[in-house]
Amino acid sequence: VLPLGFMMDEDVIDAWDYSDLDEIEAQNRLAELLGADEPMLTEIPSESVVGESTIDVQEDAYIFATYESTTVDSMTEEISDGRTKSFTKVSHGYTLDLGYCTAGTQVRIKNSNEERVNITAYALNLDAADTAYQTLNEQTMEMTSFSDTKITGTIDVKKEGRLIFAVADDAGWKLYVDGEQTDPEV
């Protein structure tokens, strides 16, 4: 997991145009810009019928899935090893984290409305993810204190770029750099 704050190269930010990409293509493009030699998420076979989708996992991997727009509000994952997981508010559209599965595992995703929801499944390439992570982890903020109203930390910037924070853009937060209040870009 990346720290709360990390530096990102401006060239990467400028080159990462994801406006015409879906969420998986955008992540793969970012991983490539961060040095990955292969896609971070690779499509794997899946089949969708009314009421459920099935993924037959061929290789050990973390599995994710996207789906077409739907009015279905909840889905349930059932894995052949007995694990289950519920997803709510899926009508909002997000990537489903189906967890780590070994080769030979069958994943079924059932929906509450007995509708056909077309699923596209992906396997995570750990080498590509690690390469991207290591690039982002080169310059990170060390948090020195935090509370529900204040976060304090330091970062020694060795290469110019943009400081990225994993903090929600909620009213009331102020950003200070070297003691000077600065307007954040969101």
Residue ranges of model-derived segments:
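Active-site-proximal, structured, solvent-exposed surfaces of multi-pass membrane proteins
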Residues: 1-186
